[in-house]
């Protein structure tokens, strides 16, 4: 059995409806996943209003699960994962970024909590798949512009073009009180040489003024009716803008629920998806498949089904620790573009965590490997 990410996806496959991801599309995702380390957070982007069951693959790299070390070039001494051997210029820059991010005490290590790679998959993937790349800030990060520029210069291999930098600064300065940048993306796979800004802290009330200030080339009448119907059913909105010399027409609004990893809120997700179904943005079969995806998986009764590295870790931790896979809906995104009908996408998450019994304190601990390992210490 593989020690790569495809082993995790294989465990999730029985719970992933072919209405969302066809067997052929899943095979294409697996071709990419078997080249990547077993990151503890990955998932699928599914289009809800189209009958085609296609999906893109997302993978989150973190320090805690060792995936950051693999990207940095120090976590794969045996060369098990092909990303360590990719010679494409984009991957060479990604590894340079990973090495800087992995330096203890560096500004990137302090500011950036994780990175997210998104692979667009339309058919059989290229032998060397090229992802879009997102840096996601720590909660307490300063979000300093200089750090953003340093990160993007590493990724692009050159500083931001002056016109792009000027427009990015204008978008950040135009944020209302409470608004902040949560992530910044370099869209390598789409050959867009600008920046994607992911912004939190906006609301249906502050969004029209913000989009007007930054020069979005659309009218609020194109998105306000749908957002007004959706907003009461979500906890938080996030905005994604593609920023080059100008703000690009394509606009994304993410809809999040404030649910915990311990318990999924399928009722509220169902209510949100029903609103989209009523407006023709979500097929009924896909709505049902999304709700059915949500759940969890552990293999205490079948440890032989675990990927080898999890089996080894589980045996080393002993009988009081258990690897768990959570299946969640991370968020739903509404996409608006002037002159086009809106589109809805769902982002499914597959999250690997550990459940440990802290016998000293008489409680259970649910978290990453280091957290659970610490709870088991005598």
Language model segments and positions:
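An N-terminal, globular interaction/scaffold subdomain
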Residues: 1-120
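Extracellular/lumenal glycan-associated surfaces
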Residues: 56-62, 131-139, 191-206, 250-259, ...
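Short small/polar-residue motifs
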Residues: 36-47, 109-118, 176-185, 232-240, ...
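Extended intrinsically disordered, low-complexity coil regions enriched in Ser, Thr, Gly, Ala
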Residues: 61-91, 142-163, 204-222, 266-281, ...
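Ser/Thr-centered flexible coil motifs
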Residues: 19-22, 161, 283
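Extended, well-ordered protein cores
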Residues: 97-202, 206-219, 228-233
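Short, low-complexity cationic-aromatic patches
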Residues: 46-52, 123-127, 186-193, 244-247, ...
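C-terminal structured domains
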Residues: 206-378
């Amino acid at each position: 059995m593989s020690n790569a990410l495809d082993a995790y996806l294989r465990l999730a496959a029985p719970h992933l409806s072919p209405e969302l991801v066809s067997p052929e599309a899943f095979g294409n995702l697996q071709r990419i996943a078997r080249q990547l380390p077993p990151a503890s957070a990955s998932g699928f982007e599914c289009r809800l209003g189209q009958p085609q069951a296609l999906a893109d693959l997302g993978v989150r790299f973190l320090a805690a699960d060792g995936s950051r070390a693999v990207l940095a070039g120090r976590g794969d001494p045996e060369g098990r994962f092909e990303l360590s051997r990719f010679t494409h210029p984009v991957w060479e820059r990604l590894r340079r970024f990973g090495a800087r991010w992995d330096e203890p005490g560096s500004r990137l290590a302090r500011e950036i909590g994780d990175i997210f790679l998104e692979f667009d998959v339309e058919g059989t993937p290229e032998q060397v798949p090229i992802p879009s790349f997102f840096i996601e800030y720590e909660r307490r990060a300063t979000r300093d512009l200089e750090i953003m520029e340093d990160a993007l210069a590493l990724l692009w291999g050159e500083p931001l073009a002056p016109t792009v930098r000027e427009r990015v600064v204008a978008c950040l300065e135009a944020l209302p009180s409470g608004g902040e940048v949560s992530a910044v993306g370099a869209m390598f796979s789409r050959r867009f040489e600008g920046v994607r800004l992911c912004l939190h802290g906006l609301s249906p009330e502050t969004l029209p003024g913000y989009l007007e200030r930054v020069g979005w080339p659309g009218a609020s009448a194109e998105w306000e009716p749908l957002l007004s119907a959706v907003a009461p059913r979500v906890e938080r909105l996030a905005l994604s803008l593609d920023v080059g010399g100008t703000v690009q027409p394509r606009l994304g609004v993410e809809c999040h629920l404030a649910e915990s990893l311990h318990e999924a809120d399928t009722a509220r997700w169902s209510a949100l998806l029903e609103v989209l179904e009523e407006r023709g943005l979500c097929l009924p079969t896909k709505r049902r498949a999304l709700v059915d995806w949500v759940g969890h998986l552990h293999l205490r009764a079948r440890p032989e089904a675990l990927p080898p590295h999890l089996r080894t870790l589980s045996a080393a931790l002993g009988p009081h620790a258990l690897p768990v896979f959570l299946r969640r809906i991370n968020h739903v995104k509404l996409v608006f573009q002037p002159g086009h009908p809106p589109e809805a996408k769902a982002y499914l998450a597959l999250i690997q965590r550990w459940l440990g019994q802290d016998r000293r304190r008489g409680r259970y601990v649910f978290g990453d490997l280091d957290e659970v390992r610490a709870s088991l210490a005598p």
